[in-house]
From Swiss-Prot:
The di-lysine motif confers endoplasmic reticulum localization for type I membrane proteins. Catalyzes the second of the four reactions of the long-chain fatty acids elongation cycle. This endoplasmic reticulum-bound enzymatic process, allows the addition of two carbons to the chain of long- and very long-chain fatty acids/VLCFAs per cycle. This enzyme has a 3-ketoacyl-CoA reductase activity, reducing 3-ketoacyl-CoA to 3-hydroxyacyl-CoA, within each cycle of fatty acid elongation. Thereby, it may participate in the production of VLCFAs of different chain lengths that are involved in multiple biological processes as precursors of membrane lipids and lipid mediators. The keyword Oxidoreductase applies. This is Very-long-chain 3-oxoacyl-CoA reductase. Belongs to the short-chain dehydrogenases/reductases (SDR) family. 17-beta-HSD 3 subfamily. It comes from Homo sapiens. PANTHER family: RH59310P, VERY-LONG-CHAIN 3-OXOACYL-COA REDUCTASE. It catalyses: a very-long-chain (3R)-3-hydroxyacyl-CoA + NADP(+) = a very-long-chain 3-oxoacyl-CoA + NADPH + H(+); 17beta-estradiol + NAD(+) = estrone + NADH + H(+); 17beta-estradiol + NADP(+) = estrone + NADPH + H(+); 3-oxooctadecanoyl-CoA + NADPH + H(+) = (3R)-hydroxyoctadecanoyl-CoA + NADP(+). PROSITE patterns: ADH_SHORT (PS00061). Its EC number is 1.1.1.330, 1.1.1.62.
């Protein structure tokens, strides 16, 4: 009986310690969530980082919304996309609405010989924020060997989703390091957090963006440069082929308004509270369950697409 008493006391303290630890973890998580998703860090985004923001893929969707949001915060904006007509239109809209200076650079990120032109266009600018947003995905989920025009898709997706991030960072980062301030926001994807079969190349390129961002943040945060990996799930954009926004599929404007608050607070973010909850749940699923669910979903989407195109 006497020997059982110390054991009971030990178990009591183990239990009490566990409860206290869990309570602290929950309290910290709630505090962090309130700080990020409630209060945010909008005040840290603006000309204080540098006069200019540079946004790639800036004529539609998330990129356009970032350009507008940064202009709203008083930053001059360089818009970089493929279509000169669209660039001129968005540039005019931003100038008129936010009363800030804009510049445009028309290039196709599928090409590799564009970066001298971009370098010339950015010369002499004090760049505080770079948003690497330009990207491409699949037309529809497909098995790797059956992707139409596979050779071209491989080249384009690497150039647009990977090379652009590296080269734009190479152009802009030195000025930020020299001034000891700046932020690079790399738009990855929820598809980059875990493997997505039938979107294999896209998923892999977005994983690159995520890892590149995390590594770069560790390398340069001591030099005053904040690098963020943004991992959205579905947003109602042309790229995602979603027309109507919902709670879990927000408009680009809603998503960016939320994501901009996380700059300086989260170096890796889903950008939007509902997406953060989705990411937490998905990341904690056993991998075999997750892969089975995603494979079945994408097989269903593939079958629907092929049936629809066959009818047409």
């Amino acid at each position: 009986m006497e020997s059982a008493l110390p054991a009971a006391g030990f178990l009591y303290w183990v239990g009490a310690g566990t409860v206290a630890y869990l309570a602290l973890r929950i309290s910290y998580s709630l505090f962090t969530a309130l700080r990020v998703w409630g209060v945010g860090n909008e005040a840290g985004v603006g000309p204080g980082l540098g006069e200019w923001a540079v946004v790639t893929g800036s004529t539609d969707g998330i990129g356009k919304s970032y350009a507008e949001e940064l202009a709203k915060h008083g930053m001059k904006v360089v818009l970089i996309s493929r279509s000169k007509d669209k660039l001129d239109q968005v540039s005019s809209e931003i100038k008129e609405k936010f009363k800030v200076e804009t510049r445009t650079i028309a290039v196709d990120f599928a090409s590799e010989d564009i970066y001298d032109k971009i370098k010339t266009g950015l010369a002499g600018l004090e760049i505080g924020i770079l948003v690497n947003n330009v990207g491409m995905s699949y037309e529809y989920p497909e098995y790797f060997l059956d992707v139409p025009d596979l050779d071209n898709v491989i080249k384009k997706m690497i150039n647009i989703n990977i090379l652009s991030v590296c080269k734009m960072t190479q152009l802009v980062l030195p000025g930020m390091v020299e001034r000891s301030k700046g932020a690079i926001l790399n738009i990855s994807s929820g598809s980059g957090m875990l493997p997505v079969p039938l979107l294999t190349i896209y998923s892999a390129t977005k994983t690159f963006v995520d890892f590149f961002s995390q590594c770069l943040h560790e390398e340069y945060r001591s030099k005053g440069v904040f690098v963020q990996s943004v991992l959205p799930y579905f947003v109602a954009t042309k790229l995602a082929k979603i027309r109507k926004p919902t709670l879990d599929k927000p408009s680009p404007e809603t998503f960016v308004k939320s994501a901009i608050k996380t700059v300086g607070l989260q170096s890796r973010t889903n950008g939007y509270l509902i997406h953060a909850l989705m990411g937490s749940i998905i990341s904690n699923l056993p991998s075999w369950i997750y892969l089975k669910i995603v494979m079945n979903m994408n097989k269903s989407t593939r079958a629907h697409y092929l049936k629809k195109t066959k009818k047409n």
